[in-house]
Structure formats: structure tokens, C-alpha cells
Design a protein with these regions (language model features):
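N-terminal beta1-alpha1 cap of cysteine-dependent amidohydrolase-like domains
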Residues: 1-65, 70-77, 184-188, 192
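A structural micro-motif
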Residues: 3, 30-32, 80, 102, ...
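Cysteine-nucleophile active-site neighborhood
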Residues: 56-128
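Amide-donor transfer/coupling interface in amidating biosynthetic enzymes
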Residues: 113-192
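Redox-cofactor binding/interface segments in oxidoreductases and associated redox assembly factors
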Residues: 50-51, 84, 174
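A secondary-structure boundary/capping signal
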Residues: 10, 85-87, 107, 142, ...
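Glycine-/small-residue-rich active-site loops that bind phosphorylated ligands and cofactors
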Residues: 13, 92, 181
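Short polar/acidic secondary-structure junctions
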Residues: 26, 96-97, 130, 146
């Protein structure tokens, strides 16, 4: 079996996410073709889509200006798997807490940006994630927290009483960076 995985490649850990998706694919005997999304017209050929971290305001401006936002929306509305991490979570949210940031309103959540502090406050913590047998070593870098969820959103993980991972339909979103370690279970949970 094969799978085409699109990764929004305007910012973030593209190669690390690609490696994680490929590792997850290997555990399912699935060949993964990685497509780095940089312009409109690429997402329709993707089976799954990943929106990595970065600076959410810059990413929002780029995807809207380049016509990529409409394709992300169409992908999600077709109930195709989508994993959004950190800034990707903010981009998909209903409310980012910033009126200047245009979100896609695909995920019925409200987020608080930089909820765990600035860059120097980055940390790793083992968290229990629904669907995983063992705690996941989550890396938080300028991470948002989810402060409100809609009725159709399943909370997958919390850390210190704050929501850090959710699922709504075929969308999995995390406040942390699952790509920074050799553990590909979050990518597996989202795509396989």
C-alpha cells in the first residue's frame, strides 16, 4: 500500500515530520510519498496532510495569500486525515485569541498562544495520550494551550490541567511538537 503525505513547507520541522510519517508508514507496511506543499494545487493529490509549527501569523498570511487555505479547508471537509502541531493547531482553531490572525475555523477550539511561556521556557514532559499505551514524550516550544473545546471535539491529552491534544473527525491537533523525537506514535495515531 502507498500513501501521499502533504506537509505544509512554509515553516517548521518539515524533514522531521517527513521522517516520522515514514517511520509510522513502515510499521503498517505502507510506502509514504512525501509532498512538500509550497503552493496551491498540490494538496488535492494528498491522502493525508500535516500542518507543522512555526509562527502562526506568518503561516496564516502565507496560506491565505497563496490560495493554500482553501485547499486545506477542502481536504479537512472531505474528512481526510490531517495532523496539526503547535502553530498548525492555532491555524485550524475557531478562535486564536488574536483578532488579527485569520484562522481556518476547522477545529472547534479556542487556543491561548504561548500558554507555556516563551522560547527559553521550552520543556519536554511525558503525557498520557488517549489511544497510546505508554506516555508520549511531548516537547513544548512556545506552545499554545487549548482553553475551550466544542461538543464534537475529543480531548486526547492534558498536561498540568491544560488541554494539549484533541481530535475532531479526521483532524488530530497537538500543542506540542511530536516530530522532535524518534517516537512516531502521534503521526501513527493521526494517519493510520
Amino acid at each position: 500500500m502507498s500513501l501521499t503525505a502533504g506537509i505544509l513547507a512554509v515553516q517548521g520541522d518539515v524533514s522531521e515530520h517527513a521522517a516520522a510519517i515514514e517511520r509510522a508508514g513502515q510499521t503498517h507496511d505502507t510506502a509514504v510519498n512525501i509532498l512538500e506543499i509550497r503552493e496551491s494545487g498540490q494538496i488535492p493529490s494528498c491522502d493525508v496532510l500535516l500542518l507543522p509549527g512555526g509562527e502562526s501569523t506568518a503561516i496564516s498570511r502565507l496560506v491565505h495569500r497563496e490560495g493554500i487555505a482553501d485547499e486545506i479547508y477542502t481536504h479537512a471537509r472531505a474528512n481526510k486525515p490531517l495532523l496539526a502541531t503547535c502553530a498548525g493547531l492555532i491555524l485550524l482553531s475557531r478562535d486564536s485569541g488574536d483578532d488579527k490572525l485569520e484562522t481556518l475555523d476547522l477545529l472547534d477550539v479556542t487556543v491561548e498562544r504561548n500558554a507555556f511561556g516563551r522560547q527559553r521556557d521550552s520543556f519536554e514532559a511525558p503525557i498520557s495520550v488517549t489511544g497510546l499505551d505508554e506516555p508520549f514524550p511531548a516537547v513544548f516550544i512556545r506552545a499554545p494551550a487549548i482553553v475551550e473545546v466544542g461538543d464534537d471535539v475529543d480531548v486526547l491529552a492534558e498536561w498540568n490541567g491544560r488541554i494539549v491534544a484533541v481530535r475532531q473527525d479526521a483532524i488530530v491537533a497537538t500543542a506540542f511538537h511530536p516530530e522532535l523525537l524518534e517516537d512516531s506514535r502521534i503521526h501513527d495515531l493521526a494517519f493510520f
